[in-house]
């Protein structure tokens, strides 16, 4: 991090590319950010910029699971002889379950007819998990449909919680704080329920597991979403581009008020893209490279 004795390096040409979590952390440790936060941890204010670490956005997802009647899921494919067969298949053909991504199927829906584009994405897998974090499968064949709100309105923050660069920053997601986010996710969960109960799936779906069939009201679904939901790990926005008081970089990705320092990563996105953030971040990097080259030419 650019802090203490290295603070003077800020005034040279620098490009910060630490991501939406660590870019604001490094800036704050370097004395660039909200003076109130910096002084709280004894950090000298080099440059006042209240927007650093604000405007945090991420996709929020809820896993809904069903038990499947037929033995056609990932559970059966990763046991005994089937697992040996799949391992050999991958070794010789580079195909099969060992090539599967986290979600093998996706779908996009509009939760309200008046909106022009989808506002929910489904991540679908032919498996359900007893413990998602440890990747332990359920004891029965299962299916997971995970609605994810694409354009959340809720905003959180990422800030340092000490002057020690080894300490992780405080991440406040503030998910589902806005009513539109709550309504959208609830509707997304209801649509997932309707998909799983469609006539075309009656020979496959045995029963609803989580949330179970007794959880039907909006309040119950929201409680389930709050308890079981999690991030999709698409953090953006904490050093946002713009011209308002909370903007951190200008339209050439330079720290506002510091012409020699740029931020080039997903943190500069003013709003979250309605999909994965990898490709947009590559675009940001390529655009920034062109800007840097243009600036070098103009300085010669």
Task: Locate each region found by the language model.
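Single conserved hydrophobic/aromatic residue that forms the stacking wall/gate
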Residues: 1-11
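Short hydrophobic core segments
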Residues: 12-29
